Design a protein with these regions (language model features):
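Structured beta-strand-rich core segments of catalytic domains in phosphoester-bond hydrolases
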Residues: 38, 46-95
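N-terminal, active-site-proximal structural segment of metallo-dependent hydrolase catalytic domains
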Residues: 1-50, 60, 65, 81
Length: 95
């Protein structure tokens, strides 16, 4: 079975401290879609990514605001960040 998990984490650092990574490792999804990451990619703790998963982040230009992430067990053919809108792509809402 192919499993997709989507979560509004309301802050990746907080969700990681509350056990997000362990829960994802137990549930073993193939794809994880995260909304409201609220961190720059460089500020996201390495332990927030389950072992063996690849990650792509689309962070908002405003620190601590919005942001999305895609984690996958297998490398996808293509990953697109943003959808070409100057107005909305700065909010980090599309992976």
């Amino acid at each position: 079975m192919f499993r997709i998990t989507t979560l509004n984490v309301n802050g990746i650092r907080s969700a990681t401290r509350k056990g997000l990574t362990q829960w994802l490792e137990q549930s073993k999804p193939d794809v994880v879609c995260l909304q409201e990451v609220k961190a720059d990619e460089c500020d996201i703790p390495a332990e927030s990514r389950p072992h063996g998963m690849r990650a792509w982040y689309h962070c908002a230009t405003r620190r601590g605001y919005a942001g999305t992430a895609l984690l996958t067990a297998k490398r996808p053919r293509e990953v697109r960040l943003g959808f070409g809108s100057k107005e909305f792509d700065a909010e980090g809402r599309y992976v």
